[in-house]
């Protein structure tokens, strides 16, 4: 009768005057039903396990297929120098930055895999024309160079600015007259200060053109120059990385779009396809997600439609 004591319905059955045979029969039926239900549950569980297994195998196969496609995809070689936050080497020795992320995603959507190579910025034009690299991609301003390369459309807006030490008595562009300024060679600031065409740019005493962009900060810190000029984003990144406190003048020397540049004789049309992907990445929010990883107020750097 041990089975009766375990039956939750025993009191109900006795109160309704069921005899012992009926109780046994009831218990047998309940157990039989329970066995059947357990059997059904086991079968359902087995089916679910099989389905999950198939799905996991499918995912693994899909991932393996994608990896295989990635290995076999045509390669694009992108050349840039070290220019945080656009292109630099992370603590794991891998290229990273705004341009690296945008280029990787855009080329992936076009079916290419990307290899990033560090170049001497002064050699960029020769390298792309000789085919040593496929394109130049490193916070590269378009304005004034339209006829030198085949360009993508701009994917970001960049301000070229002047920065000075906090204690400097330079507060405006006009205060730069007769001063010494440092710039990276073959950049837009070098062109602007060596051959000024805008009336707001004063005649400076001397322009130091340095190959390594980080040297401009050293020259400013040592007092060799009175000011430096570069992309605002690059200056702010340096200030953040090295805990420096420069003062950036309010007035910019140049506002431009930045893009990727291909050789003028490159007839593959990749720059046009990339431009389409830039539009796509703007619309689906990918551009803002990428830029937000490195810069605050990402939206203001993506207002490319505001460029003249």
Predicted feature descriptions by range:
Residues 91, 103-112, 189-210, 239-243:
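Ligand-binding cleft/hinge of the Venus flytrap
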Residues 82-83, 91-94, 140-142, 165-169, ...:
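Short coil/turn segments
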Residues 64-139, 209, 284:
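Extracytoplasmic small-molecule ligand-binding "clamshell" domains
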Residues 55-58:
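C-terminal motif of bacterial Sec signal peptides marking the signal peptidase cleavage site
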Residues 60, 100-109, 170, 174-188, ...:
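Extended ligand-binding regions for polar small-molecule ligands
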Residues 104, 108, 113-175, 247, ...:
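Acidic, polar ligand-binding/catalytic clefts
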Residues 123-126, 139-148, 192-195, 219-255:
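A ligand-binding cleft/hinge motif common to bilobed small-molecule-binding domains
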Residues 80-82, 157-164, 240-279, 297-308:
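Periplasmic-binding protein-like
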């Amino acid at each position: 009768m041990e089975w009766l004591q375990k039956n939750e319905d025993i009191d109900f059955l006795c109160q309704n005057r069921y005899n012992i045979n009926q109780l046994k029969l009831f218990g047998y039926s309940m157990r039989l039903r329970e066995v059947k239900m357990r059997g059904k549950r086991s079968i359902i569980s087995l089916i679910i396990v099989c389905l999950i297994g198939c799905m996991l195998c499918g995912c693994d196969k899909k991932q393996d297929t994608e990896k295989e496609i990635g290995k076999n995809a045509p390669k694009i070689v992108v050349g840039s120098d070290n220019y945080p936050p656009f292109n630099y080497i992370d603590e794991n020795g891998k290229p990273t930055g705004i341009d690296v992320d945008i280029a990787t995603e855009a080329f992936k959507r076009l079916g290419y895999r990307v290899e990033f190579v560090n170049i001497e910025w002064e050699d960029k034009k020769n390298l792309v024309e000789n085919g040593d690299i496929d394109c130049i991609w490193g916070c590269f301003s378009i304005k004034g160079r339209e006829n030198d390369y085949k360009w993508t459309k701009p994917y970001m807006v960049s301000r070229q600015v002047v920065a000075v030490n906090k204690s400097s008595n330079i507060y405006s562009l006009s205060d730069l007259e007769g001063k010494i300024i440092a710039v990276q060679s073959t950049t837009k600031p070098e062109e602007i200060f060596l051959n000024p065409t805008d009336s707001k740019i004063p005649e400076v005493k001397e322009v130091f053109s340095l190959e390594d962009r980080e040297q401009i900060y050293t020259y400013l810190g040592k007092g060799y120059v009175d000011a430096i000029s570069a992309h605002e984003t690059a200056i702010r990144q340096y200030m953040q990385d090295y805990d420096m406190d420069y003062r950036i003048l309010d007035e910019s020397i140049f506002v431009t779009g930045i893009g990727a540049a291909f050789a003028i004789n490159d007839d593959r049309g990749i720059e046009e396809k990339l431009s389409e992907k830039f539009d796509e990445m703007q619309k689906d929010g990918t551009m803002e997600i990428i830029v937000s990883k490195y810069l605050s107020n990402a939206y203001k750097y993506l207002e490319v439609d505001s460029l003249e």
